[in-house]
């Protein structure tokens, strides 16, 4: 297997397990539902999965909330941080120091933990520096060419974390080569996905009004970075060859985009659909989908697409879900897709290219053997990424960080020494 920075967390049977001899008190720092953002959904799913394991862990929530907002209010939140308020971060750090918390788990995205005024001002590193309990920080975005202020922020956050987690090997390499993060601190734990059994697909097709349709789908918060207009263009040609083809664009407009611009982008998609006469071939489902609804829509999907426009996107939760569902995927070649869809686990296309999207989608529809190979390879690659497995990996890492702090020894963490090539993207 290729030598990669960081130690690799694999399936539970690949772990050196440490005894969990007492209950851990863990503080989860993140946005949380009902706030509509990917990090909130991820944190909620991870915490629910940890609670369903046998790990002796008690979770407390530290919610990142909009300043002076009541929209994010939850009764089960013990601490609240006002997003953009550096003093609020430090106040909560001091409160955590007075608590019985053993370890802090942080879900990081730049917009949640800092502010911009021409350069990035990070609020997380001072928070971590003020903490007495050790912290594990998960980076959901790792940019290959960061602004100097962002590079410095990630370096400092990692320096004040006992361990850092990323979800792809590309991100692990960037942390080491670009940000100067000690590889011994870096763990690769895949994005979790629900356990999916698609034995009721026919019933679901009837419920959704999709019987007899070839379903192409994409889900997630809608915004211009998703490149959805190129899929609308694609459907003009796909529908001409396959009149039963239907594109489902599933998800609400990103709330921050809606606050700035209203529904301008969604309206532009609707106008294009009407102009091209595609009302019977493109359906926009303007809802924030629950986990079960996502699973149900994936069950009826024949081709999943992520026509995203940002080549530097290091992680896509929707792509992880589609692979976890064993779906044939077409995607632009952003960083996560390039790693995840290698070795015939999906088809990659160029950016902003309706012709390439059209060709790839038609290949999957018209070549049953190709579709079957893509589905089988996707399922095989994702078999260890179900939330129960990911939760056990995270729980073991949290325990190891606490054990290391208690031992006050310098030896590196040993959370996992082996990862299957299909899971990691490495080659054996």
Tell me the role of every PLM-derived stretch.
Residues 260-288, 292:
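Nucleotide-activated donor-binding/catalytic signature segment of Leloir-type glycosyltransferases, i.e.
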Residues 197-210, 215, 269:
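A short helix/loop element that forms part of the nucleotide-sugar donor recognition site in Leloir-type
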Residues 363, 370-384:
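A short, well-ordered alpha-helix in the C-terminal region of glycosyltransferases
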Residues 162, 280-287, 296-313, 327:
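Acidic donor-binding loop of glycosyltransferase active sites
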Residues 343, 347-354, 363-368:
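Conserved acidic donor-binding segment of nucleotide-sugar-dependent glycosyltransferases
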Residues 323-324, 328-331:
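Short hydrophobic beta-strand element within catalytic cores of glycosyltransferases
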Residues 210-226, 232-235, 247-250:
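Conserved donor-binding/catalytic core segment of Leloir-type glycosyltransferases
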Residues 170, 192, 253:
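Carbohydrate-associated surface elements
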């Amino acid at each position: 297997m290729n030598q990669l920075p960081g130690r690799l967390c694999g399936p539970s049977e690949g772990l050196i397990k440490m005894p969990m001899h007492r209950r851990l008190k863990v503080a989860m720092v993140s946005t949380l539902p009902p706030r509509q953002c990917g990090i909130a959904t991820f944190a909620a799913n991870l915490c629910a999965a940890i609670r369903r394991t046998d790990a002796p862990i008690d979770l407390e929530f530290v919610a990142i909330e909009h300043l002076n907002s009541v929209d994010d209010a939850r009764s089960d939140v013990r601490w609240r941080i006002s997003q953009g308020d550096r003093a609020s971060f430090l106040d909560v750090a001091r409160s955590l120091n007075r608590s019985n918390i053993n370890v802090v788990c942080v879900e990081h995205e730049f917009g949640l933990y800092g502010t911009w005024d021409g350069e990035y001002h990070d609020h997380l590193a001072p928070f971590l520096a003020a903490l007495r309990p050790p912290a594990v920080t998960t980076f959901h975005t790792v940019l290959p060419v960061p602004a100097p202020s962002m590079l410095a922020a990630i370096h400092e956050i990692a320096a004040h974390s006992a361990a850092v987690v990323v979800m792809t090997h590309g991100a692990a390499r960037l942390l080491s080569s670009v940000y100067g993060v000690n590889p011994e601190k870096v763990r690769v734990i895949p994005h979790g996905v629900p356990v999916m059994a698609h034995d009721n697909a026919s019933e679901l097709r009837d419920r959704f009004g999709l019987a007899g349709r070839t379903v192409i789908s994409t889900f997630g918060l809608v915004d211009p970075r998703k490149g959805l207009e190129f899929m609308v263009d694609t459907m003009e040609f796909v529908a001409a060859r396959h009149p039963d083809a239907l594109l489902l664009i599933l998800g609400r407009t990103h709330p921050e985009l809606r606050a700035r611009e209203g529904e301008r982008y969604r309206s532009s998609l609707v106008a294009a659909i009407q102009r091209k006469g595609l009302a019977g071939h493109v359906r926009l489902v303007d809802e924030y989908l629950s986990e079960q609804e996502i699973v149900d829509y994936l069950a009826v999907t024949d081709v999943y697409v992520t026509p995203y426009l940002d080549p530097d996107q290091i992680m896509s939760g929707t792509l992880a879900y589609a692979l976890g569902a064993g779906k044939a995927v077409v995607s632009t070649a952003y960083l996560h897709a390039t790693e995840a869809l290698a070795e015939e686990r999906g088809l990659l296309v160029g950016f902003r290219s309706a012709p390439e999207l059209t060709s790839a989608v038609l290949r999957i529809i018209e070549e049953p053997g190709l579709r079957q190979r893509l589905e089988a390879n996707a399922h095989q690659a994702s078999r260890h990424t179900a939330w129960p497995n990911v939760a056990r990996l995270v729980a073991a890492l949290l325990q190891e960080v606490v054990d290391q702090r208690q031992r006050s020894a310098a030896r590196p963490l040993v959370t996992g020494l082996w990862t299957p090539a299909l899971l990691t993207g490495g080659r054996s």
